[in-house]
């Protein structure tokens, strides 16, 4: 498990601001396989994971969902045959928060554990 994945998600105040561009750059260096994109004017992290079949994709989706429930921070998940697209951003801040990077790192760990 990476150092970033070991961190706990931190509570944030409603109305808080997203993290800065400098913070995004520093945190993204810790999860270089994630894409930083903007959708409907909101920056988010996104990554596509591939699987041999639908069962693997569903198992991964459920594991990410369980991790999200434990932290109270939830992604957008698109599950298809042989692939899952995961997107992290913080709705309440209208952009990215450190929690998104923590959960992206945990998502990578879940994938590695299931595909070891």
From Swiss-Prot:
Belongs to the pterin-4-alpha-carbinolamine dehydratase family. NCBIfam families: PRK00823.1-1. This is Putative pterin-4-alpha-carbinolamine dehydratase. Keywords: Lyase. It holds the Pfam family Pterin_4a. It catalyses: (4aS,6R)-4a-hydroxy-L-erythro-5,6,7,8-tetrahydrobiopterin = (6R)-L-erythro-6,7-dihydrobiopterin + H2O. Its EC number is 4.2.1.96. It comes from the Bacteria. InterPro entries: PCD_sf (IPR036428), Pterin-4-alpha-carb_dehyd (IPR050376), Pterin_deHydtase (IPR001533). Disulfide bonds: none annotated. One of its GO terms (molecular function) is 4-alpha-hydroxytetrahydrobiopterin dehydratase activity. The keyword Kinase does not apply. One of its GO terms (biological process) is tetrahydrobiopterin biosynthetic process.
């Amino acid at each position: 498990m990476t150092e970033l994945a070991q961190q706990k998600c931190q509570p944030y105040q409603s109305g808080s601001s997203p993290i800065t561009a400098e913070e995004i750059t520093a945190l993204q260096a810790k999860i270089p396989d994630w894409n930083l994109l903007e959708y409907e004017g909101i920056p988010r992290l996104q990554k596509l994971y591939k699987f041999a079949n639908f069962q693997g994709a569903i198992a991964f989706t459920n594991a990410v969902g369980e991790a999200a429930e434990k932290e109270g921070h939830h992604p957008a998940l698109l599950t298809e045959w042989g692939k899952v697209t995961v997107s992290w951003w913080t709705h309440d801040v209208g952009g990215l928060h450190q929690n998104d990077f923590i959960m992206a790192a945990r998502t990578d760990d879940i994938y590695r554990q299931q595909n070891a």
